[in-house]
Amino acid sequence: MIKLFSLKQQKKEEESAGGTKGSSKKASAAQLRIQKDINELNLPKTCEIEFSDHDDLLNFKLVICPDEGFYKGGKFVFSFKVGQGYPHDPPKVKCETMVYHPNIDLEGNVCLNILREDWKPVLTINSIIYGLQYLFLEPNPEDPLNKEAAEVLQNNRRLFEQNVQRSMRGGYIGSTYFERCLK
């Protein structure tokens, strides 16, 4: 019993000592979970995470550089905004690189089932990263956000590949201009 009391007293003293330096804010559940997710990241060699503010783990960028498939040689940047409802609510993920892709629209919205109806709190940032990487390896024309790209992929894979290459080099597809995104 005395040991328990001394542990409580020690903790109280540590908290009050920390309180004199400035008000210490308790980490939210979302912050604790994102810290755990980041610590347990197992990034593939084609991905890298960038934090503009190392004290803010709730906002970061993911860079994917596919090394195979239609998008090989491209560099695609995604922004992650993790809300206070995480892990019960999925993070908001946007593609900042304009890309000709059936599952990413021209505004950067991403069609990935685990970011919507199939989200579960047991999923992690790592799950999302692998899901995004898979979209570049296997674009899904069955669930498109960019219907025009999906139709071309379904009807003429060669033309789709040419359009992807043209867009990544920097050029027009129809009336839409794509900035160069090759590494």
UniProtKB/Swiss-Prot annotation:
GO molecular function: ATP binding; NEDD8 conjugating enzyme activity; NEDD8 transferase activity; ubiquitin-protein transferase activity
Group of enzyme by EC: transferase
Residue numbers spanned by region Disordered: 1-28
Record field: catalytic activity: [E1 NEDD8-activating enzyme]-S-[NEDD8 protein]-yl-L-cysteine + [E2 NEDD8-conjugating enzyme]-L-cysteine = [E1 NEDD8-activating enzyme]-L-cysteine + [E2 NEDD8-conjugating enzyme]-S-[NEDD8-protein]-yl-L-cysteine
Example GO BP: protein neddylation
Changes after translation: The acetylation of Met-1 increases affinity for DCUN1D1 by about 2 orders of magnitude and is crucial for NEDD8 transfer to cullins.
CDD domains: UBCc_UBE2F_UBE2M (cd23794)
PROSITE patterns: UBC_1, UBC_2
The keyword Translocase is assigned to this record: no
SUPFAM superfamilies referenced in this protein's UniProt entry, alphabetically: UBC-like
Modification sites for N-acetylmethionine: M1
UniProt xrefs under Gene3D superfamilies: Ubiquitin Conjugating Enzyme
Occurrences of domain UBC core (ranges): 29-173
Pathway: Protein modification; protein neddylation
Protein family according to the UniProt entry: Belongs to the ubiquitin-conjugating enzyme family. UBC12 subfamily.
Function: Accepts the ubiquitin-like protein NEDD8 from the UBA3-NAE1 E1 complex and catalyzes its covalent attachment to other proteins. The specific interaction with the E3 ubiquitin ligase rbx1, but not rbx2, suggests that the rbx1-ube2m complex neddylates specific target proteins, such as cul1, cul2, cul3 and cul4. Involved in cell proliferation.
Record comment regarding domains: Both the N-terminal docking peptide and the catalytic core domain must bind the uba3-nae1 complex simultaneously for optimal transfer of nedd8.
Identification of the protein by name: NEDD8-conjugating enzyme Ubc12
Species assigned in the record: Xenopus tropicalis
Organism taxonomic ancestry: Eukaryota, Metazoa, Chordata, Craniata, Vertebrata
